[in-house]
């Protein structure tokens, strides 16, 4: 049956204060009756479950075996047929991938005079509790024939017009609660996010990984090349940092004998905001003793593929109107190999000429650090010429030592580490490597990072003496990887902006 919004939902901004005042008056009347916010209604059913179970029933079957239901939800639509009958649509949070909505039908005869009179004064956005029996309308829509109707929560603010929604994108992010009420796609996105993260946790548990929690406040920022947020611990009178990565703590646990550990939690980096970056973001990092970066690539591929299947129903996704197949084996290229493939104008000789690469980077507006060697320059050129073209899942492998201070050096190629980064749809999704477990080598690399920081590199790492001490007790050969959960969710849910997959993204203060 066709239903429509009422005037309150289509309110113009200048009418909003008037509508709020009218609703407050209704709430005042409820307070006087002592029934403003009851908390004794217990729903027993969900809209999506009722549709799944009874949509296939005929009108005759529902009449022959009446089904009594008790349900609560927010009233999203209402259509009155005089004083004797009214249809409304209630919305609850049910449904694996979307919302649950179900129509209700109230009549003077069945619902009662007092409840019907009250219904006429209910507004869209009000939360109602209903008891009734299921039936099907002439248009075969599953509907609850109401025998008991109660107002559970009075909504004071009018909902946006359903045809126009929230006024702009920033308002959607700032008032996510309204966006979730109005937008089925938003609800579907965050249900998919939950499904994907639950899938990852199951996959890790099935592969004998132990989930752990490590500190969010660090005395030394480490585990990644990034600028930290700085805070002060009053009781200890010391400077502390919101963590940029949990890596060094997780590897301490491997030293302690936990061979397989993982953590899904927040990291914080005091850097720019963009459609791909948020200062607070979710990462999964995992470490497995007696593995290397080749094992990690296979395992990471399997984790991501299963998460996509569990959240999306298939490993074949669509992003921005273009297909992305996660079912196929992921590609593997070196940094120079990727440049050769996606920027074939460069010769092999040019790609091994540091001065030539510096000149090319200048054309892109990139000024490398004075201490940058050939490997770092090649990586910078890759980022400018090839990275954005890596649509299909691709591992870029064998990163230079100078940009990989925590990775194990290659046994066969000087200056190269056993490290990879995973890219898809032109953005980095994961970073992993065979871990450096040589305490003396790690100490030397930390010293090189300190020198780089002294030379002006704000993202260079600090020297972590306690981590070196941990390595001196002996860490088994280990592989470790970090997966950017938010960016992965963007791809799985076909979301163009990282804010679309964060329930409450960071925004500037409201005026």
Swiss-Prot record:
It is found in: Cytoplasm. Keywords: Aminoacyl-tRNA synthetase, ATP-binding, Cytoplasm, Ligase, Magnesium, Metal-binding, Nucleotide-binding, Protein biosynthesis. Its main location: cytoplasm. GO terms for cellular component: cytosol. Its cofactor is Mg(2+). Mg(2+) 1 binds at residues 421, 428. PANTHER family: LYSINE--TRNA LIGASE, CHLOROPLASTIC_MITOCHONDRIAL (PTHR42918:SF15), LYSYL-TRNA SYNTHETASE (PTHR42918). Homodimer. This is Lysine--tRNA ligase. It comes from Janthinobacterium sp. (strain Marseille) (Minibacterium massiliensis). The lineage of its organism: Bacteria, Pseudomonadati, Pseudomonadota, Betaproteobacteria, Burkholderiales.
């Amino acid at each position: 049956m066709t239903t429509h919004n009422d005037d309150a939902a289509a309110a113009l901004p200048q009418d909003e204060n008037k509508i709020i005042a009218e609703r407050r008056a209704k709430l005042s009347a409820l307070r006087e009756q002592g029934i403003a916010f009851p908390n004794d209604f217990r729903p027993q059913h969900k809209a999506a479950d009722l549709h799944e179970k009874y949509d296939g029933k005929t009108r005759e079957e529902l009449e022959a075996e009446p089904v009594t239901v008790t349900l609560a939800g927010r009233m999203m639509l209402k259509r009155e047929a005089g004083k004797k009958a009214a249809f409304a649509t209630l919305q609850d949070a049910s449904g694996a991938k979307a919302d649950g909505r179900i129509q209700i039908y109230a009549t003077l005869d069945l619902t009662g005079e007092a409840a019907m009179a009250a219904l006429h004064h209910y507004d869209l956005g009000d939360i109602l509790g209903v008891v009734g029996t299921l039936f099907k309308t002439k248009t075969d829509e599953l509907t609850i024939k109401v025998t008991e109707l109660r107002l559970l929560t009075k909504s004071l603010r009018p909902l946006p017009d359903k045809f126009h929604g929230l006024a702009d994108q920033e308002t959607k992010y700032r008032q996510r609660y309204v966006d979730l009420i109005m937008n089925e796609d938003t609800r579907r996105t965050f249900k998919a996010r939950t499904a994907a993260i639950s899938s990852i946790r199951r996959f890790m548990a099935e592969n004998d990984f132990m989930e752990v929690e490590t500190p969010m406040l660090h005395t030394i920022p480490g585990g990644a090349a990034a600028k930290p947020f700085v805070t002060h611990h009053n009781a200890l009178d010391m400077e502390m940092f919101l963590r940029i990565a949990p890596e060094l703590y997780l590897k301490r646990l491997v030293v302690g004998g936990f061979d397989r550990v993982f953590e899904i939690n927040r990291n914080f980096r005091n850097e720019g905001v963009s459609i791909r970056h948020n200062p607070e973001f979710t990462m999964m990092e995992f470490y497995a003793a007696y593995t290397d970066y080749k094992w990690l690539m296979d395992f990471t591929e399997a984790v991501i593929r299963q998460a996509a299947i569990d959240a999306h129903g298939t490993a074949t996704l669509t992003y921005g109107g273009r297909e992305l197949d996660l079912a196929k084996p992921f590609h593997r290229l070196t940094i120079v190999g990727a440049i050769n493939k996606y920027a074939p104008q460069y010769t092999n000789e040019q790609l091994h000429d540091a001065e030539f690469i510096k000149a090319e980077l200048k054309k892109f507006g990139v000024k490398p650090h004075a201490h940058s060697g050939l490997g770092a320059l090649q990586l910078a050129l890759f980022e400018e010429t090839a990275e954005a073209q890596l649509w299909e899942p691709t591992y870029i492998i064998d990163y230079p030592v100078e940009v990989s201070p925590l990775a194990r050096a290659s046994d066969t190629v000087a200056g190269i580490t056993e490290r990879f980064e995973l890219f898809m749809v032109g953005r980095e999704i994961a970073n992993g490597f065979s871990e450096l477990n040589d305490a003396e080598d790690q100490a030397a690399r930390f010293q090189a990072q300190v020198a780089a920081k002294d030379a002006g590199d704000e993202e260079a790492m600090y020297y972590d003496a306690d981590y070196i001490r941990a390595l001196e007790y002996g860490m088994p050969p280990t592989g470790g990887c970090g997966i950017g959960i938010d960016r992965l969710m963007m791809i799985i849910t076909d979301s163009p902006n990282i804010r679309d997959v964060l329930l409450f993204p960071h925004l500037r203060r409201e005026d």
